[in-house]
Amino acid sequence: MARTQQSFVNRKDKPIYISVEMWPECFELEPGEKLTLIWDAPDQGEAVQIDFVNDLELVVWPNGNAEDMQFLIDDKPARSRSWAFKHCDPATGNLR
């Protein structure tokens, strides 16, 4: 396994949502924020698959050993931000 890092930057003028599966974890990124995932990916083949749901949501499927995955937002630990949405009503999933 190779230690791998993948980052996503929100360059939009509104929040975006990134789900990391299989767990699931989901992060709301404010404009300008960067989410970085760090995990043990396979030495060969795809390290990650990314599915775009729409222009504000994507789903990330890391391959390899992701049990000890690190989640960083702007280079700071961010696991506590998973499912902590400011702009989305958790009951309906609609943006506020």
Where are these regions (language model features)?
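Short loop/turn positions at the edges of beta-strands in beta-sheet-rich folds
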Residues: 10-12, 31, 52-54
